[in-house]
């Protein structure tokens, strides 16, 4: 009997501990509001090597995209977790349900819209052609014949570089992040790169050793959007509603000006 009683007691304790663990897990998974109702928490991917939109400073993720996503979450009453990763893996992670969405200077393209949905556009970027500061031979894409283009994988710049390779006979060298492709051009191991205008403008402005310059006009007029899983209209609406409020109350402008100044909006 004592043995049976011990077994029953052990089972009871195990069940109680299991229940406590489950409750703790639930608390970790969702934040509790003051009213006791659970707050939705979404995980968003980003590429933390893309200043001024997302980068690390003093051990924290900051930038236009990070501040904007946090402000939208605050407006709409949900929590957000930022998960850094390589840019090329962001869209696949959304389609594999490993992320709820992503904000990473992602250009809205027809190809991407086949697999994810986007928020309303929140920033017009546009690609620029960048060369070493000593290079006076390349002034436009037509001058890329026989030249080498350094480019980051999975970007709209990579798509345009591929077109230039076919049209002008350029060679492409791929990289996983923007700093690596910048350095390749700075070291004169590649002749040019393609980057979003606000991003490269920021890089050149804050880095006296960049050894880069922009040549010619903007090559296109890409718009950035916040990506969500295909068909997730609920999250898409929350983002659009929050973004609209921030644009109307002036907070959006404050975020952009914080990193780029009013002239760069």
Regions found by a protein language model. Give the residues of each.
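C-terminal motif of bacterial Sec signal peptides marking the signal peptidase cleavage site
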Residues: 16-19
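Ligand-binding clefts/hinges and TM-proximal coupling segments of bilobed small-molecule sensing domains
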Residues: 22-33, 81, 156-173, 211-215, ...
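Extended ligand-binding regions for polar small-molecule ligands
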Residues: 21-23, 66-75, 135, 153-155, ...
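Periplasmic-binding protein-like
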Residues: 48, 124-131, 197, 201, ...
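Ligand-binding cleft/hinge of the Venus flytrap
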Residues: 56, 69-78, 157-175, 204-208
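Acidic, polar ligand-binding/catalytic clefts
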Residues: 74, 79-143
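A ligand-binding cleft/hinge motif common to bilobed small-molecule-binding domains
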Residues: 106-114, 162-163, 186-187, 191-221
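Extracytoplasmic small-molecule ligand-binding "clamshell" domains
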Residues: 29-105
């Amino acid at each position: 009997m004592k043995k049976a009683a011990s077994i029953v007691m052990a089972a009871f304790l195990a069940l109680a501990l299991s229940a406590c663990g489950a409750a703790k897990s639930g608390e970790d998974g969702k934040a509790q509001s003051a009213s006791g109702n659970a707050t939705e928490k979404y995980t968003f991917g980003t590429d933390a090597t893309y200043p001024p939109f997302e980068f690390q400073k003093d051990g924290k993720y900051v930038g236009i995209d990070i501040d904007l996503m946090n402000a939208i979450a605050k407006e709409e009453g949900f929590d957000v977790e930022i998960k850094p990763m390589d840019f090329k893996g962001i869209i696949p992670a959304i389609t594999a349900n490993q992320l709820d969405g992503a904000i990473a200077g992602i250009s809205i393209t027809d190809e991407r819209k086949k697999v994810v949905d986007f928020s309303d556009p929140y920033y017009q970027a546009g690609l620029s052609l960048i060369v070493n500061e000593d290079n006076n031979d390349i002034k436009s894409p037509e001058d890329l014949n026989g030249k080498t283009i350094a480019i980051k994988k999975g970007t709209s710049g990579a798509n345009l570089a591929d077109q230039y390779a076919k049209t002008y006979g350029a060679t492409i060298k791929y990289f996983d992040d923007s700093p690596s492709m910048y350095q390749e051009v700075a070291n004169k191991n590649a002749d040019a790169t393609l980057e979003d205008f606000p991003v490269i403008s920021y890089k050149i402005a804050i880095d006296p050793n960049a050894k880069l310059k922009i040549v010619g006009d903007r090559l296109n007029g890409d718009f950035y959007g916040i990506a969500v899983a295909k068909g997730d209209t609920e999250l898409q609406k929350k983002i659009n509603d929050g973004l609209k409020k921030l644009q109307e109350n002036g907070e959006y402008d404050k975020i952009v000006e914080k990193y780029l100044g009013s002239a760069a909006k």
